[in-house]
Amino acid sequence: MQVTLTWDLLIIIFFAIVMTYSLIIGRNESIKIITATYIATIVTHGVGGYIEQLSQQSHIILRTLGIAIDSTTILAIKLLVFIVTIVLIAVQGGIDVDYEDSGATDTGIAAVLGFATAALLLINLFTVLGQLPLLDPRMTTIPPLLTVAKQSLLAATMISYQHFWFTLPALILIATSFIGRK
């Protein structure tokens, strides 16, 4: 059996891994991951914007010092900041979520939260890769993302409906907050 690697397959695998991880860690930790992801989104865009501004204003000094800050460097810094912020907040952020364990209901909620987390992470990665501000309508026309969207119906759907995918986890958190409260 020959499997062809496509963007759709990668997206499906990404969703499967994140959903599986959410089922393993459970509802409470999944909520922490979503919260950390929203905070990391803001931090990433803030730090990335500051670095872009600094590199534009100080490009002569930076070049003299032998420091090259190009778009690839900024992209790498943004991805690193995004990942590190999520990990730090989820592990050390002081966020305490404690819902009553309700068995199958909690498992179902963890799966739904996993799906929402995967969507949020992916839409954030698309935004960072496109080097755009958050929820920028130009996301559908940026060359790197346009290429992916042309090759993948799933990516095109996520990019086209970025506002939905970005708000979905928050809406799910609100809806599920009434289930299993202590």
Model region roles, listed by residue range:
Residues 1-182:
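Alpha-helical transmembrane segments and their juxtamembrane interface "caps"
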